[in-house]
A protein has these predicted regions:
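PLD/PLD-like phosphodiesterase catalytic module centered on the HKD motif
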Residues: 1-163
Length: 163
């Protein structure tokens, strides 16, 4: 990892071993929350990941029309340049809105799947960048406007390679 991605190794070392180790912010693990007072939203990190990725995967328990609406302009832009994505959702507690799924199905570059067995309740957003680098956001945020912008949510963003 150090020869191909020295900045990634430095970021992991600074984030998990020694805070004083020099590293670029882009590669540091980040705790992501919605904080109106600091003008921070989980949504900003999701949008940033989408705008800089070559491919992406979402795995969320719930999707709502409000959640899709927060991403719609970026999804349109990704479709225009052929960036592919896969989204896995659940029907757990029947919270996912059918209209949100219909809206996502309109994108030719997206593959949408629904987990129908068990209590599928994961929440993860994975973005592949150039050079086989990946950014993963994992935590409590579903694909709803409230979860991505206002709810009390805890998420961790980490970067890694595919090795």
């Amino acid at each position: 990892v150090s020869q191909e991605h020295p900045h990634l190794e430095q970021g992991l070392r600074a984030g998990f071993v020694n805070r004083t180790y020099p590293a670029l912010n882009e590669y540091l693990p980040q705790f992501l929350v919605n904080d109106a007072a600091k003008h921070k939203k989980v949504l900003s990190s999701i949008l940033s990941g989408l705008r800089s990725c070559d491919e992406f995967w979402f795995s969320v328990a719930f999707v709502t029309t409000s959640g899709v609406a927060t991403l719609i302009q970026t999804l349109v832009a990704l479709e225009a340049v052929g960036i592919r994505g896969k989204i896995l959702v659940s029907q757990y507690l029947y919270f996912t809105q059918p209209e949100a799924l219909r809206r996502l199905l309109q994108f030719r570059n997206l593959e949408l799947r629904i987990a129908v067995d068990g209590d599928f309740h994961s929440k993860g957003y994975l973005f592949q960048r150039k050079g086989n680098l990946y950014d993963l956001i994992i935590g409590s945020s579903n694909l709803t406007a409230a979860a991505l912008s206002t709810n009390t949510e805890w998420n961790l963003k980490v970067s890694a390679t595919n090795e």
